[in-house]
Amino acid sequence: MAENKYIVGSRDDSDFTTWTAAELAEKIHAREISSQEVTQAHLDRIGEIDGDIHAFLHVGADEALAAASNVDDALAAGDQPTSKLAGVPLALKDVFTTTDAPTTCASKMLEGYMSPYDATVTMRLRAAGIPILGKTNMDEFAMGSSTENSAYGATKNPYDLERTPGGSGGGSSAALAAGMAPLAIGTDTGGSIRQPAALTNTVGVKPTYGTVSRYGLVACASSLDQGGPTARTVLDTALLHEVIAGHDANDSTSSSHAVAPVVEAAKQGASGDLSGVKLGVVKQFEKAEAFQPGVLETYHANLEQLKSQGAELVEVDCPNFDHALNAYYLILPCEVSSNLARFDGMRYGQRRGDDGTRSADQVMSLTRAEGFGPEVKRRIMLGTYALSVGYYDAYYLQAQRVRNLISQDFAKAYEQVDAIVAPVTPSTAFKLGEKVDDPLAMYMFDLFTLPLNLAGVCGMSVPGGFASDSGLPTGLQIMGPAHGDDRLYRVGAAFEAGRS
């Protein structure tokens, strides 16, 4: 098979795009290489291949190199690194506000919009000395599972340019897989970090709800959205998790709970030993109808590997998971219809038809009609209907009751096990255009990831190998209890070590 030029190559001392973030940080901090060299190497890689992949919506070369220069100058002056990742560049999903780059959420509604403030995640990255290479492509307002809902064109999977990298954060994961960035930030509302990670052979973590600030994260569904770290190794992901997590007074849903010791856990897991660890296998997931045979085969091989590493597998019964998809796709549109009401053409973003002949209502209507894409409109309509008089109790409140039962299922499971393992997706990456006209088929792709968001607990996707029938990447999902994020990293790092 011919070598795929779009996939990051094997480790090469002369090519910084093949190094892990931990390796880059060590050498930058020892002043054996410079952050500017590393950042430029990744900018060159973006220039070389992103025209074909379209992972980035905006590249900020000057800003990234200036940030890298600041790190190099501080180290040369004898200062200590401002974080364990200082000098290592990163790709940021275009749903976090930035003062020096547009924040579009991949929507025409926010085309060219410049935020007057940085998101807390953005501020923490800057304070940590991490150069931001640019803003990555996504499904519009984080609504979708393929990045095809972007108003600026789909991102392509580096493993097969005819296929999706997943969504909504396909741009961040594609950038990692292609060696355009060693680190990236995503958001996960129903699987938007974990699902692209699985389809691109990368690592993605959805932290416990409330542990990464949502201040400056443009809201899709406020009770479900959570920013999180992505990278190519479990340790790199843990190092980034440590940078962005922690209480934030600007976010009313921010948790004051101490950040879990994720880096320590990743290092502990690197031994590969899982003796004494109990892992739950969800009974309901085994009977999913939409499984691609190669994905199920790889998943069962992953379970055997975990057993060989000393883990005990325990079947757990989560009966309400069968209703998670229905509950999620009621709760999410309801929150979407409320959150996106602010995009009215009056205060910020696009304004259409304001020629002096139309009323404010007409301008607002035209702005929303032209500014939002089909999937966003679909979810606004669904949510508005479900919240309307006469339907609120039957739909929204009932979905919230199911959500509570799903949380109880998780709580009961974690009384028996330390973590739960599951597939991430029912199939490997599908072809672009294959599901775009079938929203229900697209929604089914989130079957294994969204229960976790409804419960507010944490989860990871770690590379699980390649499916025998498609030759494409799969992911193993590891789920932990609230504030048990360190368990993900211990099990994930051990599984990663066992595979290598």
From Swiss-Prot:
It catalyses: L-glutamyl-tRNA(Gln) + L-glutamine + ATP + H2O = L-glutaminyl-tRNA(Gln) + L-glutamate + ADP + phosphate + H(+). Pfam families: Amidase (PF01425). GO terms for molecular function: ATP binding; glutaminyl-tRNA synthase (glutamine-hydrolyzing) activity. Keywords: ATP-binding, Ligase, Nucleotide-binding, Protein biosynthesis. Its EC number is 6.3.5.7. GO terms for cellular component: glutamyl-tRNA(Gln) amidotransferase complex. NCBIfam families: gatA (TIGR00132). HAMAP family: GatA. This is Glutamyl-tRNA(Gln) amidotransferase subunit A. The lineage of its organism: Bacteria, Bacillati, Actinomycetota, Actinomycetes, Mycobacteriales.
